Amino acid sequence: MIVLGGTWSFYPEAYQIWFIKRIFDALEDFGAGVDRTGDVWAALESASQLHPANNTPQVALHGAELQRTYNQVVQSIYADEMRRSRELGERLAEQERSPVDEYATWEELEAAHARNEDAPCRCVGLVVETRPDHLSEAEVIRIRRLGCTKVQIGFQSLSDAVLKVNKRGHDVAATRRAVKLLRRAGFKIHAHWMPNLLGATPETDLEDYQRLFGEPDFRPDELKIYPCSLIESAELMRFYQRGDWKPYTHNQLLELLIGVFQLTPEYCRLTRVIRDIPGTDIVVGNKTTNFRQLVENALAARGERSADIRAREVRFRSVDAGALALDELWYESSIGREVFLQFIAEDRGIAGFLRLALPEIQAPSFIEELQGSAIIREVHVYGQSLEIGENAPGKAQHSGLGLRLIERAVEIAAAQGYGDLAVISAIGTRGYYRKRGFDDGKLYQHRKL
């Protein structure tokens, strides 16, 4: 389950809890065959500007004409909605609550979690999106308490000069801190990176990408690559009109992305290349939606292919589990070392993997239950989906690869001197790990070594 868009950490805690609880309510309804569509639309119509009929502001923003920032304009447009949110906060402070209030308690969320553990429709991963400068120790703990296992985070650039000229609002040091916090808490890190920003060139972008995986402080597990495209409401319009910024040509972008693909390590998954923006909204910039395919075709013409996970997934291929080799890729991180365990075919096609974090044992952890623990950050087996308990010849899922990966992680952690192996399990996978020797902790599950 992915909560896309915006800065999740900006929202009040009460709203965050309510929103996630409603996700688990929806999973419960869906698993039971309950359809509450009518109730939802009725509630939206009576109580929220999210309903199209209530979303009355119709303002066209032109970046070249803005006297205020884009966010300032939007805040002025939605002043009424912001006032309503403040009033709700005041009511909550006075312990008042109405049926349509976007509010739930931690106890209500935890009860929804418990129901989902063995529900027909389980949450096997929960993702939110935020900014580096909005992450703190307390926020990371809150995100984990919600049940999240992965965080999408906008790096955009690893150049302070580029971040500053594009008014990003934070520096590279904030990104370093955020990645370290997330990694220490065991989260999977899904970064966003934007070439062709104001102040960048194809050459500096390639250097930026080399830094992304060359420096231990970064090295994300997954990555979205969003080359900058110009839309009319962006302040970048005025720079384009003055000739201070221009989009990369097709060939410039193609050569840059070929270099990017060649530099991507096997432990990273390039989940998306090119953002889905309607071509009619793009003033200038790339409008080719299958640019990834063009890059892969260009690599193939050179006798190469991307080493990233997505390019190597077995997907619908028949898999002989006995013929797979267990490969280990060790690398440094900002908290210690990482081990990327993967079951691969002869052509390095990937059938399953596990991410194991090995933090410095003596280094203090801001999460008490992780002190001195190695951490399984992800276990994933590829191939066609199967029902729980189902098996099928030639399918990677439910063929024992996950258990074999876990047992190898146990061996590595014990050999490295750890007395405990923690896992950042999703709500719907708690039962799976209990069957494999893990006990419930406060925010994680643990197996003594």
Can you name each region flagged by the protein language model?
Residues 6-24, 43-190, 194-251, 255, ...:
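Conserved non-cysteine loop/helix-boundary elements of the Radical SAM core domain that shape
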Residues 14-21, 201-217, 278-296, 433-444:
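Short, electropositive alpha-helical surface patch
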Residues 229, 424-431, 435-449:
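Active-site/acyl-donor-binding loops of N-acyltransferases
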Residues 244-361:
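C-terminal accessory regions of radical SAM enzymes
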Residues 344-393:
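Conserved acyl-donor/pantetheine-binding loop and adjacent beta-alpha core of acyl/acetyltransferases
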Residues 392-413:
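Conserved acetyl-CoA-binding loop-helix of GNAT-fold acetyltransferases
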Residues 411-425:
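Conserved GNAT acetyl-CoA-binding A-motif
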